Amino acid sequence: MSDSEGGVEVSSPRLLIVTGMSGAGKTQAVQSLEDLGYFCVDNLPPALIPKFAELVSQSNGKVEKVALVVDIRGGAFFHQAIEVLHDLGEQGYRFEVLFLEASDETLVRRYKESRRRHPLDNHGEVLKVIQEERELLREIRGRATKVIDTSNVSNNQLKEQIITQYGGDKENSNRLLITVISFGYKYGIPMDSDLVLDVRFLPNPYYIPELRCLTGNDEPVQQHVMSQDVTKEFMEKLIDFVQFLVPHYQREGKATLMIAIGCTGGMHRSVTLTNKLGEVLSEKGYRVNVRHRDIMRV
């Protein structure tokens, strides 16, 4: 939908309706969509979808991709879904419907293994309510633009399918985002780190008077740290190590990797190496975000 209201351009975001069988993988699908930058809302009553779409369309492009989960947990409200989708189309909104399903046998097994109760099950008859749900969803399945059967699909394989179908820029969407962060050990290790590297073994510029009040963002400090043979050797090994790890992390479906590099105060050595590692990884085509946590503490 692209319209002009009061001289203001209103553009439609990419709107994805996620629905399907309970236990078929909607939660995993939504997590993958969130990694792709989608604004996700779970269990939204169908009657609210048009109003939500209108609000998002008036966000001036701040929200470009939206995924709304609509399923039988909505109870009586769910029966409005088909009518609402029809109205969305009539109003000019662009939307897609992703339907996730699995075989009865697979769904029964998943519920047995998870020990969770099916939303429609009040009497312990899992197979019966699965079949009832399949019938309730028959019409909306017919409106689906994409159906994924997850019977023999792992979580990582499902994520790959979601990325392929909805990632837009597939090359960028499927690449790990590497955050390299410097820190000072005196202030603690970043709690969300995946890899922690202690570079306090390197010569400390703090003890050189003319470098003490500078940081690893300043060229004199960078030249001093990077001129050391031990630093050069360490960086070579570190870059090889990271390049070895990244494909394995991606294969496991990891979306982000945080590498924390620490020195005593988080001002000189760690900042220099964080900048250098970020620069080299960017040149090699990785998606990189560089941060300095403690550089302003002094």
Swiss-Prot record:
A Pfam family the protein falls into: PapZ_C
MF annotations from Gene Ontology: ATP binding; GTP binding
Binding residues annotated for GTP, in chain numbering: 71-74
Organism superkingdom: Bacteria
Sequence positions that bind ATP: 20-27
Record key words, sorted: ATP-binding, GTP-binding, Nucleotide-binding
Coiled coil stretches, renumbered: none
Cross-referenced InterPro entries: P-loop_NTPase (IPR027417), RapZ-like (IPR005337), RapZ-like_N (IPR053930), RapZ_C (IPR053931)
Family to which the UniProt record says this protein belongs: Belongs to the RapZ-like family.
Annotated function: Displays ATPase and GTPase activities.
Protein name (database record): Nucleotide-binding protein Dred_3054
